[in-house]
Structure formats: C-alpha cells, structure tokens
C-alpha cells in the first residue's frame, strides 16, 4: 500500500476543558487540621486550577484530583532524594502545574517548600542570581528546583550556594519508589514565605498549618465565598497575596481558579479582564493598585469598554499588597463602569506575610471609603493659623478578619484610642511563629503573641486605616512627612506616573536631615530636564514647606521588591552608594 505523506493530516488536538465552577461536593471553609487534609478533600471534587496563555486561551486544566496525584509522586521522589521532615525545598515559583505539584509534594513529604521569585524585567542577570543566593543562604535548602528555561540562572545560584539544583522536568523523570509519608500536625511548619523586603532585608517567615488554615478560613468568611464564585488571578506565586490568597486559599476553600502568568499580564493586562468577562458565574479577583492603574491607562478614551468586556459579575475586586490610592481606583471605575463594573465590588484589605496574609478585610459591598485627615495630624505638628490646611485621603482597609485583633500603640507600647495615629499591632492564630533562624528579628517584632507590623495607622469604629510604613517616614525637625504624600504630589505633574518617584531622607553636608526625591525622567532635552527639576522642587516645597534635593534619573532605575513594589530603602542605599547615577544638570 502506498501512503501519500503530502495529503496526510495530523490528528486534531483536543482543547482542554476548564474545571467547573460548581460542584456537588459540600463546601468546607478551610476547616482542616493540615494543608494535606485540605488537598485530599478538594481532590474528591471536580474543581481545580486552569492555566491560560497571554491571550487568555486555556492551555492546561489541572483538577485538584490530578494535583493530589502528582503531589504524591513528587513527595516520593523527594523522599528518595533524601529529603527529610523539616528540610527546606526551594522552588522557583512559576505559575504552573509543576510548581503546584512540587509545593504540595514537599508538604506531603514533611519538608518546608520555599517559593523563590522569578527574574523581573527591571533586574539584570547578576542581580537575580544574587537575590537567589541571599535567599538560599537564609533558608539552607536540601534542593533547589526550577523551570528548565531558568537552568542557567538558577543553576548558577545553586552552585554558588552549594545547593543541589535540578530543573523540574528532569526531577519528574526520577523514580518514585513507594514510601510512607510522614504524618503532619497542625503546629508543624507548613512552608517558608519570604517577606517582600520593602522596608527590611527579606526574612523567611515560618508559617504553620494552623496559621495558614486559620487565615484561609478567614478569607472565605470575609469574602462570603459562594457556589457561583470563581477566582481569576495574575499575581505571582512567590508573593504572599499570590501564593496564599490566589493558590492555597482557592484550594482549601474548593474554588476553581483561572491563571495568567504575571509576565503575561504585564504584556497584555486587559487579558485579565477578558478572563473575568468570560466567567459566567461570579468572580473573585485581587490586584495591587498598580494593576487597576495599568488597565485604566490601557483602555483608550475612544474605546467603549462594553464592546469588549462584561464586568457586571465581578463580585469581589480586591485591593491590597500596596498603598491603595482612591484616585487610581476612581479612574478604573470611570474607565469600566460602561462594562458593568460596580464600585461596590472593591474590597480593600490589609495584610502581611508575618500574619500569613490577611489582617483586615472590608465588609463585602461597602467598597472604597476614605477619610480626609489634616496633614498636621499625620505629621504630629500643630496647625499654624497662617498656613492653609491640607488634607490627605486615607483609605479604610476594613475590619479585622475572623479571630484577629488589631491594636494601635504608642512607640512605648501604650494602646491608643480611636483616631490616634500610631504603630499597628495584631494578634491571632495566623500570626507567624517567627523568622527562620533569626531569633533577634523575631524578638524585635513579636511580643506576648502580638506582632509589630511596622505600619502606622489608626482605628475608627472597628475599621483600620493605614497611613504608611513606620520605617519609610521622613522626620525633619521633629515633623513627620510621609513619602507617599511627596511622591503623590510629583505624580500629579504631567508626564509622571505611580512608580516614577522615590522619596526618602538623607543627611545634608551640614549634618541636618533633608528630603531627597528621585524622579525617573523620560525627557532627553537638558533644558526640559532643568525645568522639570525646578517644577518638582516647587511642588514638593508646597507640600512639605521645605527645600529638598531633587534628582532626575533614567527610566527603569528605581529598585523594586520581588512583588514589583518600590523599595525606598534600597533606592536610598543605592543613591548614597553612587550606584544610582542622576542626570548632570546645571544648578
């Protein structure tokens, strides 16, 4: 028989089918003893994880049942590789089925998975390798497992750290001989989560099964998770909001989830809204402020949002992970109200890795509420009669989540009444047991079960208002200045946007403290740069009443944390070390 190869057609590939939103399995709000038990229960239903490409096309459906089977095999491979209970297994946290299986595999093996960041577009090869080396030195893992495409970078970090490194495709080919999986208890450490490092060197936060599941239950109760809910996320799994809020919480609360990779969101942010529009049920989706900002900027003023999007079923549009800016959120409402988006869907929140994730959530349906606070109240100074009053909008971040307490304290630890600004402390079952191998830092922030969050805020009728990071505060002549206020003032000038500006304090040649403002400038014309510098200086003086140092720097110069937030502390250190080089401008 003769076969004509030219006329043969390849067999049609079957497109994956997304896991369903609804399930007959009775919903349990994370009422489990261990994360492994939560996985077992979720695997008995039909929901799961769904991975999409940059255009929002489904490329892999991953039911929780398949995740459990793969995690079991991964646990056996880890045990065969010599991984013992309590060992750390470092995993480069790509948003993928492979990472999910390895994360749970480490948990089932009794080890502590340690999610590590992916490279970012604003950092170079050496800075990424150095970042991995620092975190590998901190967590001291038995293995580092990573995607094959990162073999060169992650492999270099592993070799430099004396850690065995392997890509996960190669690891998946290893034998998985039968073995007994260790039993876990609620107070065993479940995983290590590196804090963002926005205001201090990154720490490995030790999170127990009890702490995790308590926080995940608080998510479900706070957001009133319903049968029609589906989660949509682009958040990175190496950040606590992505890992805990959009990977572990949907599993422990049995919610199907649709994912875009973070780098795909950065290229095509409106694909996020496409996924939400396609969901026929109700949507739960979180983003830092900058995610909403990018989408509002991308939609053209000539474009009718309803021609492409249907956001009428977006039930919870969470806000968190950075300072919530009312002006940005209003711009998002203005851009997408035509597509059915309702401002009451916004759900501001407050949290940090040291509390597993959530400390407070706004009650569902209340949206964004702000209070105008006079600048002198924020700075601790009295208002002069000859000085016009200036106000700052402070966002209400909701009420303490279930089983969490929040207190506002003076510097000496004395509790403060409603309306008084002080340090934010919290206490509850989801507060960390401590930083891994760092007792001094643990003792510095944990006192009698209470966690010093490092943030400043005030309470009002049970609601928490966050005004900024204590360590970011600029104190000049005994007066407090919030860098966010200075940065916001500069952002209002034409040509600048959120993330272009970093404000901090430096010591002037005369020994006095003075504000410094670094501004990313896109203009190549020197005369225009001089004009901008002088305009910025005048704007900052109008806000602070002081002269300041203004330096214009090239775009994409300001350092970021692994989650993409501005790192003012690192910007200051790099500037003082001469590693951030401003444009040379005439005085």
Task: Label each residue range with its predicted role.
Residues 148-153, 264, 280-335, 346-355, ...:
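Adenylate-forming
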Residues 49-104, 121-130, 183, 204-213:
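Conserved AMP-binding/adenylate-forming core of the ANL superfamily
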Residues 1-62, 66-81, 85, 109, ...:
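N-lobe entry segment of adenylate-forming
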Residues 213-230, 240-283, 297-305:
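Conserved AMP-binding/adenylation subdomain of ANL enzymes
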Residues 277, 285, 296, 428, ...:
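AMP-binding/adenylate-forming catalytic core of the ANL superfamily
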Residues 315-317, 324-463, 471-473:
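Conserved AMP-binding/adenylate-forming
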Residues 47, 176-194, 200-201, 215, ...:
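Conserved pre-ATP/AMP-binding loop-to-beta segment of ANL
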Residues 500, 504-505, 516-517, 537-587:
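Conserved C-terminal "lid"/linker of ANL adenylate-forming enzymes
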């Amino acid at each position: 028989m003769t076969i004509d190869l030219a006329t043969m057609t390849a067999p049609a590939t079957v497109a994956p089918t997304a896991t369903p939103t609804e399930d007959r399995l009775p919903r349990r709000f994370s009422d489990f003893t261990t994360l492994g038990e939560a996985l077992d229960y979720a695997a008995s239903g039909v929901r799961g994880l769904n991975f999409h490409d940059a255009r929002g096309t489904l490329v892999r459906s991953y039911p929780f049942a398949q995740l459990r089977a793969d995690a079991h095999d991964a646990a056996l491979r880890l045990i065969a590789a010599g991984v013992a209970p309590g060992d750390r297994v470092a995993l480069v946290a790509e948003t993928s089925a492979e990472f999910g299986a390895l994360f749970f595999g480490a948990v089932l093996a009794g080890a502590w998975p340690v999610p590590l960041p992916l490279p970012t577009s604003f950092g170079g090869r050496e800075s990424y390798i150095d970042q991995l080396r620092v975190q590998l030195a901190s967590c001291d893992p038995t293995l580092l497992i990573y995607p094959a495409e990162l073999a060169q970078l992650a492999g270099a970090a592993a070799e430099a750290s004396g850690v065995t490194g392997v890509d996960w495709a190669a690891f998946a080919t290893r034998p998985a001989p039968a073995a007994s999986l260790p039993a876990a208890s609620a107070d065993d450490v479940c995983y290590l989560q590196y804090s963002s490092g926005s205001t201090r060197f990154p720490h490995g936060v030790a999170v127990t099964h009890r702490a995790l599941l308590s926080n995940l239950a608080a998510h479900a109760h706070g957001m009133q998770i319903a049968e029609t809910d589906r989660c949509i996320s682009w958040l990175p799994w190496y950040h606590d909001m992505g890992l805990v809020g959009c990977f572990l919480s949907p599993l422990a609360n049995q919610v199907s989830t649709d994912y875009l990779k973070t780098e795909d969101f950065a290229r095509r942010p409106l694909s996020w809204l496409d996924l939400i529009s396609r969901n026929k049920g109700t949507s739960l989706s979180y983003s830092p402020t900058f995610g909403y900002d990018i989408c509002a900027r991308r939609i053209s003023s000539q474009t009718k949002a309803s021609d492409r999007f249907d956001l009428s079923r977006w039930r919870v549009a969470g806000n968190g992970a950075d300072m919530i800016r009312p002006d940005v959120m209003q711009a998002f409402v203005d851009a997408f109200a035509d597509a059915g988006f309702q401002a009451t869907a916004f759900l501001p929140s407050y949290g940090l890795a040291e509390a597993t994730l959530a400390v407070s959530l706004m009650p569902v349906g209340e949206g964004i509420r702000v209070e105008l606070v006079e600048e002198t109240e924020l700075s601790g100074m009295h208002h002069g009669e000859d000085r016009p009053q200036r106000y700052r909008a402070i966002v209400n971040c909701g009420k303490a989540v279930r089983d969490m307490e929040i207190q506002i304290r003076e510097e000496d630890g004395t509790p403060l009444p409603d309306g008084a600004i002080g340090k934010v402390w919290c206490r509850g079952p989801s507060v960390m047991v401590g930083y891994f191998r760092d007792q001094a830092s643990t003792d510095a922030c944990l006192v009698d079960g209470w966690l010093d969050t490092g943030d400043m805020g005030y309470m009002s009728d049970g609601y928490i208002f966050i005004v900024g990071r204590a360590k970011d505060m600029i104190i000049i002549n005994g007066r407090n200045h919030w860098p966010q206020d200075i940065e916001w003032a500069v952002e209002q000038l034409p040509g600048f946007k959120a993330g272009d500006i970093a404000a901090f304090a430096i010591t002037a040649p005369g020994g006095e403290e003075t504000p410094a403002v670094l501004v990313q400038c896109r203009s190549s014309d020197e005369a225009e740069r001089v004009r901008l510098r002088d305009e910025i200086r005048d704007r900052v003086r109008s806000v602070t009443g002081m002269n300041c140092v203004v330096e214009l720097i090239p775009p994409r110069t300001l350092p970021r944390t692994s989650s993409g937030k501005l790192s003012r502390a690192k910007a200051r250190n790099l500037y003082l070390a001469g590693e951030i080089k401003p444009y040379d401008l005439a005085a």
